[in-house]
Amino acid sequence: MSVIAYLLILGAYLLGSISSAVIFCRLAGLPDPREHGSHNPGATNVLRIGGKLSALGVLMADILKGMLPVSLGFYLELPISVIGFIALAACLGHIFPVFFKFQGGKGVATAFGAIIPMGYSVAGLAVGTWLFVFLISGYSSLSAVITALIVPLYIWWFSSELTFPVALVCCLLVYRHHDNIQRLWRGQEDRGWKKKHSRQNGY
């Protein structure tokens, strides 16, 4: 790989390591999301602790953390395989942020942002899959896990060169939901449309 490729991969990881949830909560005077709610620095937990606008800001910022470096990779016409690893680096940064003791979020929004430049068809199918599962089950965590399991098939169909790195990203997402999966198995996971949310669920 070229020096530019290595720099972009490093830059994607560092950008992903910036915790949007912590920053927006500080700006809005909200509690630290790492110490309240689900203790997860993500948009869902920010919404849970009372910041609707902050939650929206976190969601958009986390999406951009994945979308911007991947878009730059396409703009620079880097090899598809390199772009895939740029996406992986951004998600690794969000999940294991170097600036926050490697304790980050679950990576759903950042992974979605990374997928958008790869193809609107794949991104649309991912959103559709998430919504379909959520409307049937009511579980946002189950929706995220099933979508993560299916997205590699979408990528393989539309851009097979990206299948391996995207599959790695999706494996990370499933791993980060292991607590949710255990609660789903035990029947202890709260449904997304309930007013009372579980303190253990969230992105």
From Swiss-Prot:
Localization of this protein: Cell inner membrane
Keyword Transmembrane among record annotations: yes
Keywords: Cell inner membrane, Cell membrane, Lipid biosynthesis, Lipid metabolism, Membrane, Phospholipid biosynthesis, Phospholipid metabolism, Transferase, Transmembrane, Transmembrane helix
Principal subcellular localisation of the protein: membrane
Statement: the UniProt record of this protein carries the keyword Membrane: yes
Reactions the enzyme catalyzes: an acyl phosphate + sn-glycerol 3-phosphate = a 1-acyl-sn-glycero-3-phosphate + phosphate
Entry GO terms, CC: plasma membrane
Gene Ontology biological-process entries: phospholipid biosynthetic process
Pathway(s) served: Lipid metabolism; phospholipid metabolism
EC number: 2.3.1.275
Highest rank taxon of the organism: Bacteria
Membrane topology note: Multi-pass membrane protein
Entry's Gene Ontology molecular function annotations: acyl-phosphate glycerol-3-phosphate acyltransferase activity
Transmembrane regions listed in the UniProt entry: 4-24, 56-76, 80-100, 115-135, 149-169
Entry-linked PANTHER family: GLYCEROL-3-PHOSPHATE ACYLTRANSFERASE-RELATED, INNER MEMBRANE PROTEIN YGIH
Family in the record: Belongs to the PlsY family.
Subunit structure: Probably interacts with PlsX.
Function statement: Catalyzes the transfer of an acyl group from acyl-phosphate (acyl-PO(4)) to glycerol-3-phosphate (G3P) to form lysophosphatidic acid (LPA). This enzyme utilizes acyl-phosphate as fatty acyl donor, but not acyl-CoA or acyl-ACP.
Name of the protein in question: Glycerol-3-phosphate acyltransferase
Organism: Glaesserella parasuis serovar 5 (strain SH0165) (Haemophilus parasuis)
Record lineage: Bacteria, Pseudomonadati, Pseudomonadota, Gammaproteobacteria, Pasteurellales
Gene name as annotated: plsY
